Amino acid sequence: MATMRVNACSVAYEVIGDGRPWAITPGGRFSKDSPGVRELATALAERGNRVLIWDRPNCGASEVCFTGTSESAMQADALAALLQELDMTPAVIVGGSGGSRVSLLTAARHRDVAAGLAMWWISGGVFGLMTLGVHYCGGSLKAAWNGGMEAVAELPEWAEVIERNPANRQRFLEQDPATFIATMERWMAVYCACGDELVPGLQDADARQLRVPALVFRSGASDFNHTRATSEQLAALLPDARLVEPPWGDGEWNHRSAARPGGRGEGLFIGWPALAPVLQAWADEMVGSPA
């Protein structure tokens, strides 16, 4: 595992294979080591690609960072900078769940870094978005309000980033509680469902202007976190998008997420390697040969 400082934050990453540049971003605050992520990267590398997997700021072994208009925008800017530093632009930028949002924002905010864009499990709908704001920001905001930054550093949701990068604990403690609370409120507000942002942080008008080959996998009808309507509407918004069915059944997300709390599941992303043939065929057709 290597690290690189981008935008004043140290980011952990790995590059697998050689060929056309790709970047894979998982969802939640899960790391690049979550089962299924590396396996997808390896499957793409075996098809002649150079694939970046990385820990976003606030994930895995990377540093915590509390700048930016939103957490996803901050992570998108970090991905763009990392790809540029690694001489991997333009890249095919792909991701699922929260990783799809980061991928989309990366392409929208940094047009020159994206050769193509593929997304699945795109968060949306009033319920899906409102719960995300609480999930990502609510616990930290409440802890900082009631117990200061010591209480934030003790939250289970931050245990992995402190365990894998112990210096992160001090980074939490160095935050001014009032400023941190304001950041959490700002980040939370981005998830408020509104009529002109299908995907939080990206105006629909800007999505309509994003001229990059895009592949959107249709969400399951049973998935209320990443609604089918959101995937269909995003495919309609993006001018060069193709909507396709995923290589798994309707209940993939629900099945994987239901298994996690009891420790019975293999991980949310374990099915991702099945995407490789579809992604490769689409990239060969729509993205073209790497420079």
Model-derived segments and their meaning:
Residues G128-T131, N146-V190, E197:
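Conserved alpha/beta-hydrolase catalytic His-Asp/Glu region
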Residues D240-A291:
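Catalytic active-site module of serine/aspartate enzymes centered on a nucleophile-bearing elbow/loop
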Residues R101-L104, A108-R109, V113-W145:
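Flexible "cap/lid" loop of the alpha/beta hydrolase fold
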Residues M74-A91:
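Conserved acidic catalytic loop of the alpha/beta-hydrolase fold
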Residues W54-S72, N254-H255:
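Glycine-rich "HGGG/HGxG" loop immediately N-terminal to the catalytic nucleophile
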Residues R186-L237, R242-P246:
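Conserved serine/cysteine hydrolase catalytic core
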Residues A8-E63:
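Conserved HGGG/HGGXW glycine-rich cap/lid loop of the alpha/beta-hydrolase fold
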